[in-house]
């Protein structure tokens, strides 16, 4: 099998993401303060973002504007094979979910909205022998018949040093191989978790002005 026969997978393609800053003029704060406070107290299903600062805006916009809301937009990776199932379940945006109708065209999978990954993609492989056994299992040693006598040292420190002398030569420091602690027979060690993770590539942020 050549390298051209291998089809790209959605796992290995970086996910494109960018942050959208929704800003508003500071002069419009007094006019919209009464309407925003009434909407926050009357409806609980709608999003009401607090007024922020100008941190995050470019110098040309940070003088007379303030950030109202920040939205993280994540687009699903484009897979070469259309028949291959994508890792992304559905497109989702927190702001649009609260303010828009679920059946609106803006929430369809074809739009560039946030994508939710299934929880199984974040699971790590764990081996049963890495877990400590329960006290009720018979493999554990029994602590019922303990000796009441204290442990005594039968060899002095001087005799012990003569029997097992400490070498003055330093042990050669060898670099640890990545396959030292891997078992090829285990199916969990045939892949790397980081290689199966989803990489996010952040593009330049976008700035949208909210009109009153």
Curated annotation (Swiss-Prot):
Q: Where is this region: Disordered?
A: 30-60, 129-212
| Comp. bias (Polar residues) | 167-179
- What's the superkingdom here? Eukaryota
Q: Which residues carry this modification: Phosphoserine?
A: 136
Q: Which InterPro entries match?
A: DUF4667
Sorted alphabetically, the Gene Ontology cellular component annotations on this record are: cytoplasm
Compositional bias segments (type: Low complexity): 32-49
This protein's UniProt keywords:
Phosphoprotein
Ranges of compositional bias, category Basic and acidic residues: 201-212
Miscellaneous note, as given in the UniProt record, is: Present with 2360 molecules/cell in log phase SD medium.
State what protein this is by name: Uncharacterized protein YNR014W
Source organism: Saccharomyces cerevisiae (strain ATCC 204508 / S288c) (Baker's yeast)
